[in-house]
């Protein structure tokens, strides 16, 4: 398993930072814009002015500007890829911001982590599925989150939907011009037991190992740690609902109608939010 984790780390270390001009020319620009709009709305919904935020799997710091616009007071970014953390530091230095920033290169999903403080919001965008590599890894990741989330605080995430992927597998729709999913399945193994797959996304991810999210197990694990599920919604529904509620932001971010193939990529994912319960004595 360590070999696979190293492969994932090296994959993200190898991805070069692309300038805004290059991103705008990408064939996946509409997909990127849709994903960024969804993340911006998710941050708006669950982040208050002055909040402290722990961003797990922060990558190159692509959400820093979203948090600046949300008016947070402190940001702590953690990622397994050292190169990504260095790029995030550069991005933070070069932007106008009013909040404090800290970064740390660490595996927060498979290694015990204690930053010595709690946060109002913990975010995991397109990365928490890596916690499902083993049962032990998931347990460690969930304990890391519970340890660092303030009572009443929110854990917000975007993850691939196992249900969507398996439904497409049954229908034989596992790729288009933008993406490709390859299941690592042996003949005698039932689909319910398959834990991982290979994912490729044009201009972004190249045949990287990803893990299925066991939703029931995740909810049960967080429940034992005092976190309850407050929202679960597929990306397409979330995108359409928030587009109606935030027409100005939608226009500002250059959103348009997604093609069928673009929608297929966006529709792989879902929004999931947990809230840490407040002890009755503190309520």
Swiss-Prot record:
| Single annotated GO MF | mRNA 5'-cap (guanine-N7-)-methyltransferase activity
Q: List the disulfide bonds.
A: none
What is the main EC category here?
transferase
Keywords, sorted A to Z: Methyltransferase, mRNA capping, mRNA processing, Nucleus, RNA-binding, S-adenosyl-L-methionine, Transferase
Q: Where is this site: mRNA cap binding?
A: 60, 66, 91, 129, 210, 269
The reported effect of residue 210 to A is:
Reduces activity by 87%
Predominant cellular place of this UniProt entry's protein: nucleus
Stretches assigned to the mRNA cap 0 methyltransferase domain:
26-277
Region Disordered, as annotated, extends over: 1-25
> In which family does this protein belong, per the annotation?
Belongs to the class I-like SAM-binding methyltransferase superfamily. mRNA cap 0 methyltransferase family.
Tell me how this protein assembles. Monomer.
In Swiss-Prot or TrEMBL terms, this protein is called: mRNA cap guanine-N(7) methyltransferase
UniProt organism field: Encephalitozoon cuniculi (strain GB-M1)
- Gene behind this protein: ABD1
């Amino acid at each position: 398993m360590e070999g696979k984790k190293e492969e994932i780390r090296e994959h993200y270390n190898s991805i070069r930072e692309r300038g805004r001009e290059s991103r705008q020319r990408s064939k996946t620009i509409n997909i990127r814009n849709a994903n960024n709009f969804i993340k911006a709305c998710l941050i708006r919904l669950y982040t208050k002015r002055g909040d402290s935020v722990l961003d797990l799997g922060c990558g190159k710091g692509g959400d820093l500007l979203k948090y600046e616009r949300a008016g947070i007071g402190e940001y702590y970014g953690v990622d397994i890829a050292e190169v990504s953390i260095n790029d995030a530091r550069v991005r933070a230095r070069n932007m106008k911001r009013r909040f404090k920033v800290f970064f740390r290169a660490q595996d927060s999903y498979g290694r015990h982590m204690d930053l010595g403080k709690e946060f109002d919001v913990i975010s995991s965008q397109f990365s928490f599925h890596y916690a499902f590599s083993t049962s032990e890894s998931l347990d460690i990741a969930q304990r890391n989150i519970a340890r660092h989330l303030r009572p009443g605080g929110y854990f917000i995430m975007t993850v691939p939907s196992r249900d969507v992927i398996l439904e497409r597998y049954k229908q034989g729709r596992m790729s288009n011009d933008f993406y490709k999913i390859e299941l690592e399945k042996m003949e005698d193994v039932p689909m319910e037991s398959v834990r991982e797959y290979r994912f490729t996304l044009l201009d972004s991810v190249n045949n990287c190992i990803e893990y299925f999210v066991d939703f029931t197990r995740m909810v049960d694990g967080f429940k034992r740690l005092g976190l309850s599920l407050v929202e679960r919604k597929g990306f397409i529904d979330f995108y359409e609902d928030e587009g109606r509620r935030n027409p100005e932001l939608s226009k500002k971010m250059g959103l348009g109608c997604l093609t069928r193939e673009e929608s297929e990529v966006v529709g792989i994912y879902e929004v999931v939010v947990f809230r840490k319960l407040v002890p009755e004595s503190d309520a």
